[in-house]
Swiss-Prot record:
Catalysed reactions listed for this entry: ATP + H2O + a folded polypeptide = ADP + phosphate + an unfolded polypeptide
Single Gene Ontology BP annotation: protein refolding
Chief location: cytoplasm
Native organism taxonomy: Bacteria, Pseudomonadati, Pseudomonadota, Gammaproteobacteria, Alteromonadales
Subunit and interaction comment: Forms a cylinder of 14 subunits composed of two heptameric rings stacked back-to-back. Interacts with the co-chaperonin GroES.
Family: Belongs to the chaperonin (HSP60) family.
UniProt binding sites for ATP: 30-33, 51, 87-91, 415, 495
GO molecular function, one term: isomerase activity
Record's protein name: Chaperonin GroEL
Amino acid sequence: MAAKEVRFSDDARVKMLAGVNILANAVKVTLGPKGRNVVLDKSFGAPTITKDGVSVAKEIELEDKFENMGAQMVKEVASKANDEAGDGTTTATVLAQSIVTEGLKAVAAGMNPMDLKRGIDKAVIAAVEQLKTLSVPCADSKAIAQVGTISANSDTEVGDLIAEAMDKVGKEGVITVEEGQSLQNELEVVEGMQFDRGYLSPYFMNNQENGTVELDSPFILLVDKKVSNIRELLPTLEAVAKASKPLLIIAEDVEGEALATLVVNNMRGIVKVAAVKAPGFGDRRKAMLQDLATLTGGTVISEEIGLELEKVTLEDLGTAKRVVINKDNTTVVDGAGEEEAIQGRVAQIRAQIEESSSDYDKEKLQERLAKLAGGVAVIKVGAATEVEMKEKKDRVEDALHATRAAVEEGVVAGGGVALVRAASKIVDLQGDNEDQTHGIKLLLRAMESPMRQIAANAGAEASVVTNAVKNGADNYGYNAGNDTYGDMLEMGILDPTKVTRSALQFAASIASLMITTEAMIAEAPKEDAPAMPDMGGMGGMGGMGGMM
């Protein structure tokens, strides 16, 4: 086992604070509408330019092991805020730096670290309650667009695009961000349920120009097994042919004789038919087939529940207004399922999301929920260069997370105003002893730090701005974008309550741990092994006299 180096008390804390400051100073320059860019070197390709706090934090790794521990703990603050609310990473970092700096000064002055921590915790609980009372619901498109704009570093186009996407697919809908092909940002909305399976044979195609299969008012047969024997499908095909309607078969697979017969029937015009594989795998496939059944008003034909393919009647088939299939995707538009059944299924999936502990499962369940409830919107980010594209895509994703958070818990005045107002409401809060009260005061001072940093980045005098805002009331604050004061909500400068709350809670949590640190242990740096000694000259061989 490698030797370890141990540092105690002030010796440890000074090193830790140095690491905190290096990381926080690099991150905090990005805060606010006039925040600066940070350039990140990449081992290959062009450097990345970003204004995203968590991207900057993730790049930082320090040589000194003890300083690095401090930096990594603040990096954790940014990551946690990002995971929880998708934004507020820079705010969280600025708060953490302020709490740690002030807290370690108090510890060095002889205060009890545990009492300081208790005071900080007490103040956080009170401040979060105040933020909740300051919160305003975020319901209309205008407010959603404003939140998106602020989070995307004052890019109004991004805010409007996200608001339009939410308008079209609903609050529950899935909105994804992709790299586009043009210079402009684009929004593409897929209505109905789309899944990533295309036609099983190109011979099903009936729109050669677009390379798609288009079925109007088709019957939909859902089968939870492989179909290879055409005899199993004959009763269904005959019934559908009599009804003179197209048929879509969604099964685990359709192969061999069954697929060949379907293709021949389709080409001869006996029955208009298409077949696709069911989406997903294993249990997820079963669940998605059931979703399709609920959406189209059909029944999943599964031998597990005693239903056989040969005995299918038209009542077992689902229907939809229109189905479009290309080589990669199938879209079912306007399924004929009952609204009540769909809402029941939606509620069931919501309950599963609440119970799930896996992020991957949650994401997949959220996708299923969106496909049932609204639809899917894709924001295609346009840019002139790849470097710009990456930076822009990061910003759009941030803005999307922020708007979701705003819809969830409402919004508060932006620009650090909400934290200052919440702090002013709990200024009389007292601890059980003097050290706890100092912990409370320390947090209240730290809650001003995001506003101070926004003002400093905009080239204003931080103390002047903070005093002016403190003397105002309600949502009165400083607009760093155009260097004016006024009502932040009216000016459209909003922060999601969830983002502000998460930033404060995570910053205080990790900063408290750092204040109460008494020892640090890291691997001792290895001594460089000395180089091999110089062998010097080999010397002469001397006279080898006497040799004949």
